Amino acid sequence: YTRFLGKLSELTDMGVEVHFFIGNHDIWCGDYLTKECGVIMHREPLTTEIYGKEFYLAHGDGLGDPDKKFKLLRSMFHSKTLQTMFSAIHPRWSVELGLTWAKHSRQKRADGKEPDYMGENKEHLVLYTKDYLKSHPNINFFIYGHRHIELDLMLSATSRVLILGDWINFF
């Protein structure tokens, strides 16, 4: 990743703001990208105005997912205490543990793939967005990653939700 990190640094050195939304695979990166590359890290969703439009930007991890086991595990992974303890483990073991955990997680899914789009009334991020939109009707664009599907769905005459897709396979 050295060349990629170099390009990030090159962009920020030129004054370009690079924003990174931390997700389920990124919680362990700490402040490295900020200190070394000048990247602006976001641990929570961000609402911002761009060219007169309201944007709600987020990774998407944990938003609207009803799975209680997932929520418990997520809260443990996001614990600063547990992150500090994990960082004390030598990378020889911690990296292997992380890779094994991710492999096991993928194997639990059919064919090891992310589930396809589940439809407007079952997709967690869409349901979350519809609910959020009720109390924040001025937001024009909700943009997420997390789910490895591509989606562009109009929610109203002035609001849409976009899920960016799988950047490895589709871009």
Q: Where in this protein do the model-derived segments appear?
A:
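Glycine-rich phosphate-binding loop signature in dinucleotide/nucleotide-binding domains
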Residues: M14, I50-G52, K134-N138
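A generic short-segment signal for beta-strand/edge and adjacent turn/coil regions
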Residues: L11-V18, G23-W28, R109-G112, Y128-L133, ...
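Conserved beta-sheet core of the metallophosphoesterase superfamily
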Residues: G38-E44, Y56, D61, D65-L73, ...
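Active-site-proximal loop/helix segment associated with metal-binding centers of metalloenzymes
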Residues: G60-H124
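Short, Lys/Arg-enriched charge-dense amphipathic segments
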Residues: T2-S9, M41-E49, Q107-E120, D166-F170
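Short low-complexity stretches enriched in small and charged residues
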Residues: S9-V18, E96-T100, D116-E120, I139-N140
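Core catalytic region of metal-dependent phosphoesterases/phosphodiesterases
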Residues: Y1-I50
